[in-house]
């Protein structure tokens, strides 16, 4: 009887042990099955973007000087069947600051990518200095567009603000009021982006959600300097306090 009990106990122990080993793979499989619908949507989005990339058209024109104006004329754009921009007409002119607002998925990033000619309208036309965007050589207009977001946060701070080493590290640190190191606070890092925008020689500046941790007095001072620069400044933000410094506000939900 004792031997039978030992066998039964050993069998039960092994049975429970192997069931426990199966638990994690089964849970992982279930999780992966639940993610299939969202993965499929992501895959469709990637394929749509690849298709968009392949349809870009370029010409031979060169950009002479700064970008003075940008016009979108009855632009339509969407991903597959999802229309993001419908009959969108906008005018951007140097010397003005434009606030771009709207919830996630409303088309803010799409609009920026269209202006940068990373996407191309499905209908309608985009003009740079009254010349069709697709008449310019590839990457020609990008020479005058400075996009500043938080996609560089893992880089060396000095490389972020001055990748071409035009200024000394000492000058930049004196201007900022703090030392450039790898332990910057969120506020210091975002102010670094603002400083980069102020130092840029390009004629179009796009600021994408870089204000949430910056002191309001510093933001006010930066926008005062932006006004003096006579450039096209496009500001993407959810901060209502920042919008008060813009000359006009573009609501993506109204387009």
Model region roles, listed by residue range:
Residues 124-132, 141:
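Conserved ABC transporter NBD signature motif
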Residues 199-203:
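A short, proline-enriched helix->beta-strand linker immediately N-terminal to the Walker B motif
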